[in-house]
From Swiss-Prot:
Job description of the protein: Catalyzes the 1,3-allylic rearrangement of the homoallylic substrate isopentenyl (IPP) to its highly electrophilic allylic isomer, dimethylallyl diphosphate (DMAPP).
A molecular function (GO) term: isopentenyl-diphosphate delta-isomerase activity
Residues annotated to bind Mg(2+): E87
Active-site residues annotated for this sequence: C67, E116
Cofactor note: Binds 1 Mg(2+) ion per subunit. The magnesium ion binds only when substrate is bound.
Cofactor(s) it depends on: Mg(2+); Mn(2+)
Protein name (Swiss-Prot/TrEMBL): Isopentenyl-diphosphate Delta-isomerase
Length: 184
């Protein structure tokens, strides 16, 4: 999206400025604010996406449903909704935090660094998926338990943030509970 920025953070995770999103993601990416969201359908299936080959970091890699950066003055819920519409063309509901304190740093094979305070959410998809080809090259609906097993068995096949999010016991439980509520 044109004109997007990242909110830079100091080591106490407090806002310390802003930087244009594309310029922020480099070989020495500063700590900044982001979010990650795992989307589910009414049957409790997880939407996994394959990042477009045009992405600067981890192109072509399978990952959780959607990630992004809140803009100044925007709540996380507003940011999640905005990116779901932009990347996947979907409307969502029931946004819930599953790992609010997630923070990670990872280096892509091309040297680009992710360095984020990145609260993790779950949400329910309430419309058909219409992916933006600039963001997503493929997608699949999968069973959460199957995906968690795949992440544990073959972590190299997925984005590092998805693997790290799934390694957190409380986040796994929150995702499992979210799916149970959807299935009623």
């Amino acid at each position: 999206m044109a004109g997007e920025h990242v909110i830079l953070l100091d080591e106490q995770d407090q806002p310390a400025g802003m930087l244009e999103k594309y310029a922020a993601h480099t070989f020495d990416t500063p700590l900044h604010l982001a979010f990650s969201c795992w989307l589910f359908n009414q049957q409790g299936q997880l939407l996994v996406t394959r990042r477009s080959l045009g992405k600067k970091a981890w192109p072509g890699v399978w990952t959780n449903s959607v990630c992004g950066h809140p803009q100044q003055g925007e709540t996380f819920e507003q940011a999640v909704t905005r990116r779901c519409r932009f990347e996947l063309g979907v409307e969502i509901s029931d946004i819930a935090p599953v790992h609010p304190a997630f923070r990670y740093r990872a280096v892509a094979p091309n040297g680009i660094v992710e360095n984020e305070v990145c609260p993790v959410y779950a949400a329910r998809v309430v419309s058909e998926v219409q992916p933006n080809d600039d963001e997503v090259m493929d997608y699949q609906w999968v069973d959460l338990a199957t995906m968690l097993s795949a992440l544990a068995a073959t972590p190299w096949a997925f984005s590092p943030w998805m693997v790290l999010e799934a390694e957190n016991r409380d986040a796994r439980q929150a995702l499992t509970d979210f799916v149970a509520r959807l299935r009623g």
